[in-house]
Amino acid sequence: GENILETLASRFAEIDARAEINQAKVLAAMQKNRVNATHFAASTGYGYDDEGRDNLERVYADAFHTEAALVRPQITCGTHALAVALSANLLPGDELLAISGKPYDTLEEVIGIRPSPCSLAEYGVSYRQVDLLDDGSFDLPAIRAAISAKTKLIHIQRSKGYQPRPTLSVAQIGEAIAVCRAVKPDVTIMVDNCYGEFVETI
């Protein structure tokens, strides 16, 4: 028992240090947006002037370094959030390109990989994917070649999900995004980060 704890002590210290940095990041976002007790009051009706909700979204945007955030209790799970993002950004005739291989099984019906009513495919959105290399890294030349004039949105899944591959790092994702932007600067890139912002420091 003690030997195992000693062996893992440096790893636990590393995790604790990362957790402190990320906790400070979230607290700084809350302080910047002056979160106080009034933001936790319930609201009724349509949510107009719901300062608590609006402020929570500002906190998320600041903590995750994004332009904006959509944080609602009506979004019930990760697949629901991804479906909302895909549906909002893709129109008939557009192409969705997944560059980290096949996404989660739950997205197959959303996209239309497996036939499903109201899928993106039914609305005229085409789908292609670029598989990862055998070592689990991005196939950058294949990604570069796959991006076309029709490609409207590029999907990256950070987590390995149920695949036997390593989780993608922020550095790897950044490199892939740079390749995509070099080919098509205006393409929308969506990263399913799966809480990855808390396992690294950004």
Task: Tell me what each language-model feature is.
Residues 42:
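Aromatic- and Gly/Pro-rich donor/ligand-binding loops
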